[in-house]
C-alpha cells in the first residue's frame, strides 16, 4: 500500500509577490473598449477585479482556510495525488468522493465539505454524514502532472485506486459536475464492485445511438446551436492545448480573464452580475490555485485526453452505467440536460431532481440544494454498504 503523507499548502512569499507584480504591471491602456461580456471578459470588471487582487486579496487567509481540512498526498500510478479527507461524524458515515472539473478546483467545495461530513453542526442529522474525499485531479492544482494527457476514464481508474487501495474503502459513492461528472460516470461503469452509486449534476456522456423521438431531437438541435458559441475554448484545449499555455503561463491576468469568462457565462446570475453568486475571494482563490501551481497547461490536457479515449460515447455496445444514479438537473447548466428518456438509456437513474435555480458550478452557486439532493439520494440507497 502506498504511503499517505499529511500535506500543508504553503506558497512561497516570492511567488505571491511575483504574481501581484505581474498583475499590477498589466498594460490596460492597450486594451480596446469592449461590449460588456458579449465579446468575452468585461474590461471594466477586469480592471476592478485586478485592483482588488493587488490591493486587498489575501492569499494567506485563503490558504489557511484550505489547510483547516485534513490535506494529504499519496502516489497512484506514479502520480502524486493531493486530496482532502474529512472523516464524517457518527458511527457509519458513507464514503463519498467528490471530483471537480475545469475551470474548477478543490476551492469549489470549501463551503461544502463540513456540511456533508458534519451535518449535525449545521442543523442536520448525523445519520446523513459522509467521509468526504476531495482530490485535485491529476495535472490540476496540488496534484502531480501526468506524463501525457489523461482523460476522465484514466482519472477514474486513479481515483478508484485512491478510494480502495489507498484509503481502504470497500464501497463508496462518487459525485461530480463538469469533468467530475464524467469521472464519476466512469467510476460507476468500470468499477461497479466498489463504486456503489453515483450522483451527477451534469450530463457529459452520450449514447451511441443518438437522440430518439421529437423531444430528444429538438434538444440535440438546440444543444448544437448553443455550442457554436460556447465551444471555442473546448476546441482549443482538446486540440492544441500547449499553444494556449505559452500565453497563460506568463500572464496571471490572462488566466483570470479566461476563467472568469466561464464563471460568468456558465452560472445562474442575477442581472448578469457575477458577484450576485460569487465573492471576489472565491473567484480569485480558484484562479490562484491554477497560477501558484503553474498547472494551467496540464489541467487543459484533460480535453485532449478525452478525445484520445474516444470522446463522449459511454459504450460502443450501448451498455449503460448500472449502479444507481442520481441526477441533479440545474436549469442554467452550460451543457443543457436532455429529456430523461435519453438519460435513462445511459444510466440506471434512481433519482431525478429538476432544480429551481442554479448553473454549472452548483457546489458554489447552490450548495444547499445540491447537498440536500446528495443526502436524499444516499438515504434512499436500499442498504449500506450495498452488496457487491
Give residue ranges: language-model regions:
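Alpha/beta-hydrolase active-site loop
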Residues: 147-166
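Short beta-strand element of the alpha/beta-hydrolase
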Residues: 93-101
